[in-house]
Amino acid sequence: MNTYFISFITIIIFANGINGTSVDTSNKLLLQKANDFNLSQNLSSSRTRRTIANSFRIVGIRLEDETVETKNGIPTVLVDKEQQFRVFGSGLEENTAITFTNEKNDYGGPCLKPATDLFTPIEVSSNGFSALYSVKFPSFINEFFICAKTAEKTTNHSKAATTTPLEHQGNSDFLKIKTFEPLIPVWLAIIIIVTCLGFSALFSGLNLGLMSMDRTELKILRNTGTEKEKKYASKIAPVRDQGNYLLCSILLGNVLVNSTFTILLDGLTSGLFAVIFSTLAIVLFGEITPQAVCSRHGLAIGAKTILVTKTVMAITAPLSYPVSRILDKLLGEEIGNVYNRERLKELVRVTNDVNDLDKNEVNIISGALELRKKTVADVMTHINDAFMLSLDALLDFETVSEIMNSGYSRIPVYDGDRKNIVTLLYIKDLAFVDTDDNTPLKTLCEFYQNPVHFVFEDYTLDIMFNQFKEGTIGHIAFVHRVNNEGDGDPFYETVGLVTLEDVIEELIQAEIVDETDVFVDNRTKTRRNRYKKADFSAFAERREVQTVRISPQLTLATFQYLSTAVDAFKKDVISELILRRLLNQDVFHNIKTKGKSKDDPSLYIFTQGKAVDFFVLILEGRVEVTIGKEALMFESGPFTYFGTQALVPNVVIDSPTQMGSLQSLNMDSKIRQSFVPDYSVRAISDVIYITIKRVLYLTAKKATLLEKSRKSGTFSSETFDDEVERLLHSITENEKPSCFAQNQSTRRLSNRSINSSPTNMNRSPDFVYNSVDEAIQDDTKLKNIKHADNVTTSISLVAAELEDLHSGEQDTTAASMPLLPKLDDKFESKQSKP
């Protein structure tokens, strides 16, 4: 019997070796127990024992779960949890049922108080040496022993029939199992697991959300953010300033809750399920989701959980604070993100699509960041492209007009060579200069002595901007460089000029165009597309035909007054170009009163009751006007005009169309050819006045029609200029208007031109208008006729009416000068085509 028992112990040890367990201390104890058992059997052989009917015996147990703790060879398991263990012995069969009791007894003794149900084996070895059971131990019992019996066969492995009595298998340590209860209840463990998972998510989110916001960004938000952002940043900034301490506290707290979560979850479950569930829970709910949320809303979440963060920092301070101090010493103080000039410019550029910056604001920021990199040589105007004046120039009307047309307010003045800049002329210096005095520019420059400032071409724009901003050197500087070319000594050479406007243009990355600029860009010479101002230099022209010459200023004033104040000379009747050319004719006169009596006829400009055919505008001096039979008298001064009735009828004149109005032309021809004033105008001081005769006025109107024809493309510019010059210069004060006379062939040409229109196809070739109304009606019907035919008809009609006007005063000889522009061959060929 002893040998039989020891063989079973050897089988148990061998089974442990098969399962990968070496003959350790527990196996040694098992052998020692077997020897003790053999000795006890020999000593008790003389005792009386009852006969055991059963042929099986259990000599040892082993739990299949490797994680179960073993103390002194006795396994310790958790209550109320399914446990699988293997029993070793002999004669084990499928109907060998076991149970557990808390009472000690010898082998073969009765098992009167079983503590668990009967359990049948899940599987049994073929030789009957081992069997596998699944058992759940109840609570409130600390130590269990095995009882067994041969039960009736049943399919339920957890419960067996109870009719056969149970036999105690002994109180050996190899047959003993201890239990323990969990430290906390299951429901409390579940709550703690969920709480740990929540804190794990919070710590993971704060780790990314808070640590991704550097100190510089928080300062920006505290100063420039919205009200909420300022509030949140103010709460976070004190904690974020302790970067390493915050990092260590968050990481330590995260590791703590994750470890607790894993341990508690392992207590509730075991095996592969616990591993998979804990991994998915931590990754999905503890890492990915919170970090995704806090990466976008880290500021708000960090501010609202700041108390939790401070609490964790306080709890983990004994460990996290020393570690953070070590990191501070090793890694240095955290400064935050710092942007240099290039990074700032690139930051503005790459975020242009998502920020609210305007394009001009982006350009200004970029320009300001590049000021230190650009030099004056990059933005200066070359000296050869600058508008300058020679020191020997005279400040006459032509020079001042040239200065005004240049559009500049500061004019460099050079002496001899253009690169020898000696002074500056400001446009305000000309305020008290009379152009009639022909003041030398040198005199004016010596009086004001405006200084000039020179800089080198490698000066950066930020330095120039500061100098211009101070105002000590003005807002213009000349750029010079050292010229060491050649064999001579090096010398300073002026190569260009730079102004405050140039620097500001580089600052805002755009061209500044004010009301006086001629060019959009001085370097590219791109002209500004703007309304063309009047060229006043034309009033300084001197014509030999003029017997009396006046100053250009007075000529300009006369032009402006006539074109704006006198209806007969406004631009819709007489164009500005024609009026300017008209004033270049011999229309200026003067009267000297010295040594003449009051009744001298040469002092009278108009005599009451004496017909006149001219218009008069007083420019200088005083005149006395006597009106009506009552001889009412008053004096008048400059820019008083008389005789407008001699030019136009006293009716409202409609604005002519682009090709002229036949109604207006016919009305001009039908009025009286002379005007009889009911007043007298006598000079009482030296007087300068202009006289414009009716025939010259009609010539100017005809020239205006020609100009409108040129604008519409009927005539070329050369044809127009030649014809206007001939028209205006053909009229002199002593010349009769014979140049406007036409012979019968010219008159017939005019009538033929009218009769050839579609509206007169049914009329006879000798048809002539009998009234002005007929001409007006036909003029309305001529709107759909070809452009060239209309122009020819209108101008021919003017010539015909001029002939009627002077038919009693001139010969019938044809004028030698052509009145109509000579059309080129291409235009004639187009007209000849059907």
From Swiss-Prot:
Compositional bias annotation for Polar residues: 740-763
Subunit annotation: Interacts with PRL-1, possibly at the plasma membrane.
Residues the entry annotates as binding a nucleoside 3',5'-cyclic phosphate: 604-656
Pfam families, alphabetized: CNNM (PF01595)
Protein name as annotated: Unextended protein
Functional summary from the UniProt entry: Probable metal transporter. Acts downstream of PRL-1 and protects the nervous system against olfactory carbon dioxide stimulation.
Primary gene name: uex
The entry's keywords: CBS domain, Cell membrane, Glycoprotein, Ion transport, Membrane, Repeat, Signal, Transmembrane, Transmembrane helix, Transport
Stretches assigned to the Extracellular side: 21-182, 266-267, 320-834
Membrane disposition: Multi-pass membrane protein
Basic and acidic residues bias: start-end ranges: 822-834
Leader sequence residues: 1-20
Homology family: Belongs to the ACDP family.
Subcellular location field: Cell membrane
